[in-house]
């Protein structure tokens, strides 16, 4: 009899835990999916190359140019001088280029210092890959650039060179 009571208690406890877990997951999914992909992307936290935790939405520019890249990607490296020049031509209050590196912190730091990158570079890791997918990079290729206007609307997506 004692074994039956223990079994029923464990079964009820397991059912209760599963219920709470499912309620939590469904609430989390509901909260996430009530926002647009752009709004969700702007809230993703990344480390910058100075070790600060930042979100893409922290930059006040009217236009954000998000460039997903890696140091091992030759087409990515060809784009970077163009992005550096593009940032020089536009004030950061109006337009901000943000590099989201899908690479190690050390490689990103070495590359940006050696190539005089004049815009912020964030350490993307798997969150960067997820964000790129969320913003339309369904193939997973690099480089991938997204232009976001007023933190609300994707106005351009560019895959590859």
Label for each model-derived stretch:
Residues 1-47:
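N-terminal targeting signals for export/organelle localization
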Residues 55-74, 83:
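Short active-site neighborhood of thiol/selenol oxidoreductases, capturing the structured segment around
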Residues 59-62, 92, 118, 140:
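Active-site acidic short loop of glycosyltransferases
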Residues 65-66, 97, 145:
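Hydrophobic beta-strand anchors of alpha/beta hydrolase catalytic cores
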Residues 113-118, 124-161:
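Thiol/disulfide oxidoreductase modules built on the thioredoxin-like
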């Amino acid at each position: 009899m004692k074994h039956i009571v223990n079994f029923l208690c464990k079964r009820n406890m397991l059912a209760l835990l599963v219920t709470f877990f499912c309620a939590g997951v469904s609430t989390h999914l509901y909260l996430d999916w009530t926002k647009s992909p752009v709004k969700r992307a702007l809230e993703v936290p990344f480390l910058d190359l100075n070790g600060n935790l930042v979100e893409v939405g922290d930059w006040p520019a009217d236009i954000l140019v998000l460039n997903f890249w890696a140091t091992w990607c030759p087409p990515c490296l060809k784009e970077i001088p163009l992005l550096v020049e593009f940032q020089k031509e536009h004030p950061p209050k109006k337009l901000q280029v943000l590099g989201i590196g899908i690479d190690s912190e050390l490689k990103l730091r070495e590359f940006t210092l050696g190539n005089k990158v004049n815009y912020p570079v964030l350490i993307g890791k798997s969150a960067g890959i997820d964000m790129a997918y969320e913003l339309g990079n369904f193939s997973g290729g690099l480089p991938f650039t997204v232009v976001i206007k007023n933190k609300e609307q994707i106005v351009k997506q560019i895959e590859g060179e």
